[in-house]
Amino acid sequence: MTTCQPLPKLWLLSDERNDAVLEQAIARLPRRSAFVYRHYHLDMAKRQARFAALRDLARRHDHTVILAGSPVLARKWLADGVYGPASAMPRDNALLKIVTAHNWPEIVAAERAEADAIMLSPVFPTASHPGGRSLGPVRFRLLARKTAIPVIALGGMTKDTAKRLDWPRWAAIDGLS
């Protein structure tokens, strides 16, 4: 997507476990950050209502608002972009396309989908996948530097791990909540 604004450096992802504090977390983010609404646990009507309220709050703080879901839904719900695997991305560039990736083949798929950014995870051990294997800082950097597309670090990210990773863009669920 062509945009006048640079890609945000800080990204907050919603989840069932941070729902109760999202309003405060969104308000605390620096202006022109990004908010990715997931909330897969809600039925469609409740998901849309919660999205609308959080979208409006995020916009009051000049945040970019991304919907995890179909491009059709992202347009209908007035999101700035769509989040998900490369296979779910729209062919046009009307929405900001944030593609999830965990390895090199998924990064290549993101390039083919003409992603605006790749959310590469998990960098560190994470509550989302307890006991799961993480990339670690070295492997994360090796993968991230192989693509020209901006990469957003996700997974176990907090202010401390972001400082340790020393990467320009990062995202968190619990680490920003």
Where do the language-model regions lie?
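Active-site mouth loops of central-metabolism enzymes
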Residues: 6-22, 96-100
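Structural preference for beta-strand elements that scaffold enzyme active sites
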Residues: 9-11, 34-36, 62-66, 80-83, ...
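Conserved, mostly hydrophobic/aromatic
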Residues: 12, 35, 74, 110, ...
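Glycine-rich phosphate-binding active-site loops on the catalytic face of alpha/beta enzymes
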Residues: 12, 82-93, 117-131, 154-177
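Short, acidic/polar
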Residues: 15-28, 70-72, 103-109, 158-161
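Acidic (Asp/Glu)-rich catalytic clusters
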Residues: 24-31, 56-60, 75, 111-114
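N-terminal active-site wall of soluble small-molecule enzyme domains
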Residues: 34-95
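Alpha-helix-loop-beta-strand connector modules within alpha/beta enzyme cores
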Residues: 48-64, 89, 93-104, 133-158
